[in-house]
């Protein structure tokens, strides 16, 4: 079973994604802030990370950069979630090494699953 780490401070969104991922046959790990997410990425060795950008304790960009600079986590695919379309955040996330992104206000559940399946190595 593939393991997905979801770093997101909104617990309602954590639950929604958890339900979806479970139905799709994935195991979901949760972190409610950037610092915890970074620690869990290193200790839990997830197959993929869903990363919100606006997080308490450590911003998503800091987490993303730290993950990509660490030999133990640099190859983990990362899907960034943001509300901040049109602010340059998507471009910055991709430059820092994100695999792809989702705009929170406009994604569909099918899109989430499709992006996860595409980003996950077989």
Give, region by region, the residue ranges found by the protein language model:
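Active-site residues of response regulator receiver
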Residues: 52, 82
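Conserved acidic carboxylate
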Residues: 8
């Amino acid at each position: 079973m593939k393991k997905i780490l979801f770093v997101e401070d909104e617990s309602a969104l954590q639950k929604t994604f958890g339900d979806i991922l479970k139905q799709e046959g994935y195991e979901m790990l949760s972190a409610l802030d950037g610092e915890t997410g970074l620690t869990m990425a290193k200790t839990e060795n997830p197959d993929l990370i869903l990363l919100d950008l606006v997080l308490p304790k450590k911003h998503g960009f800091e987490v993303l950069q730290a993950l990509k600079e660490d030999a133990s986590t640099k190859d983990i695919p990362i899907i960034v979630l943001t509300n901040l379309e049109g602010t340059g955040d998507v471009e910055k996330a991709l430059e820092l090494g994100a695999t792809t992104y989702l705009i929170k206000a406009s994604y569909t559940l099918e899109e989430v699953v499709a992006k996860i399946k595409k980003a996950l190595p077989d």
